[in-house]
Each structure stands twice: as structure tokens, then as C-alpha cells.
Curated annotation (Swiss-Prot):
The keyword Cytoplasm applies. It is found in: Cytoplasm; Preautophagosomal structure. One of its GO terms (cellular component) is phagophore assembly site. Autophagy factor required for autophagosome formation. Its main location: cytoplasm. The keyword Cytoplasm applies. GO terms for biological process: autophagosome assembly. Belongs to the ATG101 family. It comes from the Eukaryota. GO terms for molecular function: protein kinase binding. Keywords: Autophagy, Cytoplasm. It comes from Xenopus laevis (African clawed frog). This is Autophagy-related protein 101. The gene is atg101.
Length: 218
């Protein structure tokens, strides 16, 4: 099985990191979640509905849609908060990346543990910019909102390609494909990891600073 890989880059002010990451991760998981499966007998099941809600950002001029699941939201908040803290405490140039990996389990014979086979990985590269004053912050609030909107459109376009997804499992195999631990939604199995880098992400950071400078010059 070939694992698809998608890379997104965002350039944000420090206080925008959490909202930007949540917007991207929630958008991806909105398209990679189903309602809960209700099995009647082996091979026959119904799928519950997935509720959605609009989320308005505080530090970005942007509204995104997420799955209406408090459990999923808490899990993503926890992962993003850990990344944000690591980024802040790293002493680096404010460069890092978060990976959202979807995988399925392949049962192994005892005494070996199950094999986790990734089928799609999203990498979000984050560049944190420093701004001089409130005027620049207000411009950044709008510009990041515009750029984030473009990223969301990119995500939706990828989702609409109808490429490989794990086939719908039987009842005995559902835990090999979906995370069934949540009571109100059933995302494909996923894991989130992050890393902080020391190299300066000059291309995206410089682009954002140029956008702000050009706007100030108008």
C-alpha cells in the first residue's frame, strides 16, 4: 500500500498558533470521520450522523467547521497545546511541524504486536513571525485568515480526489480501521506527532512579513 503524503505551510504570530493548527486538523478530521457504526449482525450495519459546528477564531479573521464532538476536540486541543508549549520553550526560531497520520492495523501472530500501516500523512509546517506593533498584528490577523482559507480549500480538494481509503470493515475488524473509543464520532485511526526544528523557515516567514509591509505601505 502506498502512503499518500500532503504538506501544508502556515506562517503565524505566536498567539495564532493554536487556532491555526486546530482549524487545519479539525478540517482534515471532519473529512476523515464517520458516525458511529451500529451493527445488527455480521455484515449488516447502519452509520450514525455526524454533527458539525462553526468555530470563530479569536486571533485570526477566520471561521472553520469541525465535527461536533467534545471528546475529539479535547484530544486535538491536548496535542496542539503540547506542540505550542514545545515551540515556545524551544529557544529556536519558532519553526516546527505537526504530522497527522492515518493508519490501519494489521493483526500479527502472538507474541508480536499489531503492525500499524500508514495510508495518509498530513504534515503542517509552522513558522512563527514576530510583529512590531498592534497595527501589524491586525494586518496579520486578516492575512493569516486569507491564507488559512486557501489551505482549507486545498484540503477539501485533496479529499475530493477519491483516492484510497481503507475498505469498510466487518464488525470483528472495525477496531483495525476506526477509533471506536469516542462515543459520538468515529474517526479513522490516527496519531499526531510533532517536531521542533532549528533552521529558519525563510520562504514562508519572509512572504508573510512582505504581505504585512506591503499592506502598511498602501
Amino acid at each position: 500500500m502506498n502512503c499518500r503524503s500532503e504538506i501544508l505551510e502556515v506562517s503565524v504570530e505566536g498567539r495564532q498558533v493554536e487556532e491555526a493548527m486546530l482549524a487545519v486538523l479539525h478540517t482534515i478530521l471532519l473529512h476523515r470521520s464517520t458516525g458511529k457504526f451500529h451493527y445488527k449482525k455480521e455484515g449488516t450495519y447502519s452509520i450514525g450522523t455526524v454533527g458539525t459546528q462553526d468555530i470563530d477564531c479569536d486571533f485570526i479573521e477566520f471561521t472553520y467547521v469541525r465535527v461536533s464532538s467534545e471528546e475529539l476536540d479535547r484530544a486535538l486541543h491536548k496535542a496542539v497545546s503540547e506542540f505550542k508549549d514545545a515551540l515556545r520553550n524551544s529557544g529556536s526560531d519558532g519553526i516546527g511541524q505537526v504530522s497527522l497520520e492515518f493508519y490501519q492495523k494489521k493483526k500479527s501472530r502472538w507474541p508480536f504486536s499489531d503492525e500499524c500501516i500508514p495510508w495518509e500523512v498530513w504534515t503542517i509546517k509552522v513558522n512563527v513571525v514576530s510583529l512590531a506593533n498592534e497595527q501589524e498584528r491586525q494586518i496579520c490577523r486578516e492575512k493569516v485568515g486569507e491564507k488559512l482559507g486557501e489551505k482549507i480549500i486545498n484540503i477539501v480538494e485533496v479529499m475530493n480526489r477519491h483516492e484510497y481509503l481503507p475498505k469498510m470493515p466487518t464488525q470483528s475488524e472495525v477496531d483495525n480501521v476506526f477509533d471506536t473509543s469516542l462515543k459520538d464520532v468515529q474517526p479513522y485511526l490516527y496519531k499526531i506527532s510533532y517536531q521542533i526544528t532549528d533552521s529558519l523557515g525563510t520562504s514562508v516567514t519572509t512572504t508573510m512579513r512582505r504581505l504585512i509591509k506591503d499592506t502598511l505601505a498602501l
